[in-house]
């Protein structure tokens, strides 16, 4: 099967596609030939309602997906200890040979330039993904910055258990205080994240 790679220019052109009211994430990926499944607790836009902090809810999807994208989702998963369960779900649901794509707020850009300030409680670093890739035996395909986001592509090349040291994992994630204007804004942003589970139609 084929993997379709996007150039930086193409990614920049589509960075805000989820904000476009004329096209949901499901429409975006389905129109490009993907059998698309999204997970969100609000159940909007055809998403499946599952809790990304509860691995038992995903056992039926283990080794099911060729591509999993995490674009604006995990940085809203609280408390910080639940980050471990969320990333373990992504690991377990990806096929061997499959790819995980992460577009998440970068902690260095947050601290030095205020990028994505007050957007979320958790931020990620280059070293976080380097250590994650080493421990989980991923091939690190890309680990760069695009439009203020840490953009990472990881290929799962071996059937190994997810990073076993939870304490080590949690310490790698940066937590920053938020100055939320209201509880409504905080809850809205937390619900907004959507984990996209993609499966090429011709790779079932």
Where are the predicted features?
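Intrinsically disordered, low-complexity, compositionally biased regions/tails
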Residues: 5, 29, 197-199
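Conserved SAM-binding loop
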Residues: 1-2, 13-114
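Short, structured coil/loop segments at alpha-helix boundaries
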Residues: 11-13, 58, 191-195
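S-adenosyl-L-methionine-dependent methyltransferase catalytic module, highlighting the catalytic core
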Residues: 78-204
